[in-house]
């Protein structure tokens, strides 16, 4: 029987949606049969460039380290890694150039294992030159020893190596939790409960989207029609498009040729808005607050988009139209989710990744029901077998914790975000990106989620 061997890999990305590329690479490694995978935090670092490299290659990297166990030999593992990289459109001829994903084998087997072929060298010959790697390795296996005959570091633990070659403030540009991505909210409306009227002007909305991306959002959700309980008139398609179109055109100018950019999501329940949007900007997500109509599912299939299905008992939500009090809200949402996913699978969507489930915190749920639904993330992921997003940011259910206006609930939002990350949520939709991103990274670094 083939034995299982320890493996330590580094993952890096400095093109496109870097956080999403790290996530996809991690999922691909699991599919390749690497078991018991654990990830470090993601650190953003400056690019390491050869002298004379083009200036346009100077793009910051997202880096993480993963450990696990594999039955593949070193050469077989390298071949698997090359296949994964090729699926990202990797140009192998650009050595040291920008890339959507770069996966290196750092260590393999027991501590004394060394290997050299035309495909790889183990231990990785550059590992001691990269303090950010040593820091991440030490967070996962601090007492494993570095073994390399002739090296002054031979026999030292990674905990000690991380102290000898410390990660400095200049080395780390930022940090991110590896498991959960953040969707930043841009409300292009005059009647939202939060940020109302702040981003009606297209240039302000586009600038806010850029700021949220800079703060750590890997997805930007643009909404030009409010659907909160205070809304009486949902307005027309033309009114919604009049607000959304100029923002999309500005972002197309700014991100169209950008080498690093987020995914863009459109928050709408109107298929016509999606049809118009794809003509203006290469959007990646549909955020359907109506729960995912079949027409929206067909659009997701046609254009290769991800479909976020947000449950709501009514549109706009009404206080007299909520989930049943006689049954667990989690069970009610599971039935609804299973029914929706079955329909979307028949349309041809891959529900394991293309459909994202959102139980709709505050949309036809009491504060207690919303609290219970946030506690149900693990059940949703286990039963539905699809990604889960929670949109709890500044919601009225948080008023149970104190009398704060909607724009002053970010502390409560962040506290819930940390708890949701611990439950394995895939995406968090929030207004205040930087605070959530920093809190999740700190919690991950402290060992809560690695």
UniProtKB/Swiss-Prot annotation:
- GO molecular function per UniProt: 2-amino-4-hydroxy-6-hydroxymethyldihydropteridine diphosphokinase activity; ATP binding; dihydropteroate synthase activity; kinase activity; metal ion binding
Q: Which residue positions does the secretion signal occupy?
A: none
User: What GO terms describe the biological role, i.e. biological process, of this protein?
Assistant: folic acid biosynthetic process; tetrahydrofolate biosynthetic process
**PROSITE patterns annotated for this entry?**
DHPS_1, DHPS_2, HPPK, PTERIN_BINDING
Does the record bear Cell division in its keywords? no
Q: Where are the stretches annotated HPPK?
A: 1-166
Q: What class of enzyme is it?
A: transferase
* Residue ranges occupied by any Pterin-binding domain in the UniProt entry: 180-441
User: What does the entry list as the binding residues for Mg(2+)?
Assistant: 187
Name of one Pfam family that matches:
HPPK
Q: Which domain of life is it from?
A: Bacteria
Identify which cofactors the protein needs according to its UniProt entry.
Answer: Mg(2+)
What EC number(s) are associated with this protein in UniProt?
Answer: 2.7.6.3, 2.5.1.15
Q: Give the pathway listed in the UniProt entry for this protein.
A: Cofactor biosynthesis; tetrahydrofolate biosynthesis; 2-amino-4-hydroxy-6-hydroxymethyl-7,8-dihydropteridine diphosphate from 7,8-dihydroneopterin triphosphate: step 4/4; Cofactor biosynthesis; tetrahydrofolate biosynthesis; 7,8-dihydrofolate from 2-amino-4-hydroxy-6-hydroxymethyl-7,8-dihydropteridine diphosphate and 4-aminobenzoate: step 1/2
What disulfide bonds does the UniProt entry report for this chain?
none
What family does this chain come from, according to its entry? In the C-terminal section; belongs to the DHPS family. In the N-terminal section; belongs to the HPPK family.
Q: What is this protein called?
A: Folate synthesis bifunctional protein
């Amino acid at each position: 029987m083939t034995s299982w061997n320890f493996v330590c890999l580094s993952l890096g990305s400095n093109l496109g949606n870097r956080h999403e590329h790290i996530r996809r690479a991690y999922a691909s490694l699991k599919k390749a049969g690497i078991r018991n995978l654990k990830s470090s935090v993601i650190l953003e670092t400056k690019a390491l460039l050869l002298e004379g490299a083009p200036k346009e290659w100077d793009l910051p990297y997202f880096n993480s380290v993963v450990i696990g166990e594999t039955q593949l030999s070193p050469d077989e593992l390298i071949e698997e890694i090359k296949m994964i990289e090729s699926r990202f459109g990797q140009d192998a001829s650009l050595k040291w150039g920008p890339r959507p994903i770069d996966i290196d084998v750092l260590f393999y087997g027991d501590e004394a294992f060394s290997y050299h072929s035309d495909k790889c060298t183990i231990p990785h010959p550059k590992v001691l030159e990269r303090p950010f790697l040593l820091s991440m390795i030490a967070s996962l296996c601090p007492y494993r020893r570095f073994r390399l005959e002739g090296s002054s570091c031979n026999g030292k633990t990674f905990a000690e190596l991380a102290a000898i070659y410390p990660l400095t403030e200049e080395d780390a540009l930022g940090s991110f939790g590896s498991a959960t991505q953040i969707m930043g909210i841009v409300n292009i409306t005059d009647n939202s409960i939060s940020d109302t009227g702040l981003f009606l002007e297209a240039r302000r909305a586009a600038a806010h989207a850029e700021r949220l991306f800079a703060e750590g959002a890997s997805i930007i959700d643009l909404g030009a029609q409010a659907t909160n309980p205070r809304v009486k008139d949902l307005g027309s398609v033309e009114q919604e498009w009049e607000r959304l179109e100029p923002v999309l055109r500005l972002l197309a100018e700014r991100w169209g040729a950008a080498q690093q950019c987020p995914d863009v999501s459109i928050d709408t329940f109107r298929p016509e808005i999606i049809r118009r949007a794809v003509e203006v900007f290469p959007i990646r997500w549909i955020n359907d607050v109506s729960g995912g109509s079949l027409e929206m599912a067909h659009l997701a299939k046609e254009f290769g988009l991800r479909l976020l299905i947000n449950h709501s008992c009514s549109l706009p939500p009404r206080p007299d139209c909520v989930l049943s009090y006689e049954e667990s809200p989690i069970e009610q949402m599971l039935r609804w989710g299973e029914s929706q996913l079955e329909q979307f699978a028949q349309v041809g969507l891959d529900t394991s990744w293309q459909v994202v489930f959102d139980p709709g915190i505050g949309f036809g749920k009491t504060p207690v029901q919303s609290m219970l639904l946030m506690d149900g993330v693990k059940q949703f992921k286990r039963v539905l077998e699809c990604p889960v997003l929670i949109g709890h940011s500044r919601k009225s259910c948080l008023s149970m914790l104190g009398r704060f206006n909607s724009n002053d609930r970010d502390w409560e939002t962040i506290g819930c975000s940390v708890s949701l990350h611990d439950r394995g949520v895939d995406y968090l939709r929030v207004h205040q990106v930087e605070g959530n991103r920093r809190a999740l990274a700190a919690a991950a670094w402290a060992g809560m989620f690695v």
